Regions:
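Boundary regions of SH3-family modules and the immediately adjacent low-complexity/disordered segments
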Residues: 22-31, 48, 59-64, 76-114, ...
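Beta-strand-connecting loop/turn residues
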Residues: 39, 69-70, 140-144
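Start-of-domain marker
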Residues: 28-58, 66-68
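Generic hydrophobic-segment detector
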Residues: 8-11, 50, 122-123
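Bacterial Sec-dependent N-terminal signal peptides
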Residues: 1-27
């Protein structure tokens, strides 16, 4: 019985170590850049939710993607680095990244607000926004 218990804990320890030793992969050139696509993105010291927060990135912020392990390690334009969940950025090629940076933007100046599907506050909410968020200008159709 003691052997079985020891074997179980040995197996559990090995399984835990293998999960922690995830393969770190540098990003291929066609997705080594990205843009944050949530209003406030928590950047963490390690690629896990329980890790401490190192800084934050805002919607529309262009970032460099350094590596991927299930989480992205990113670098902001002001050279901060941290880990973000894979669902909070849109990875892209250098060409798309440069296109994003050249595009005309709208910068949110209110403390908090919303974007809508149509130019009507009763239409479906697309996202919340906070001061400093950057949105690509798509034109003024339907706006007064």
């Amino acid at each position: 019985m003691k052997k079985n218990i020891l074997f179980f804990f040995y197996f559990l320890a090995m399984a835990t170590l293998s999960l922690k030793a995830q393969e770190i992969r540098p990003m291929p050139a066609d997705s080594a850049y990205g843009v944050v696509h949530i209003s406030v993105c928590n950047m963490r010291e390690e690629g896990k939710f329980t890790s401490g927060m190192s800084t934050q990135a805002l919607l529309g912020m262009p970032v460099k993607v350094l590596q991927y392990t299930g989480w992205y390690e990113i670098q902001t334009p002001d050279d901060y680095t941290g880990w973000v969940h894979r669902m909070v950025i849109t990875p892209m090629s250098k060409e798309k990244y440069d296109e994003w940076n050249r595009a005309e933007k709208i910068v949110v100046t209110s403390h908090y607000g919303f974007t809508y599907e149509k130019p009507d506050a009763t239409s479906q909410t697309v996202s919340d926004v906070v001061a400093g968020n950057r949105l690509k200008w798509e034109g003024g159709k339907g706006h007064s």
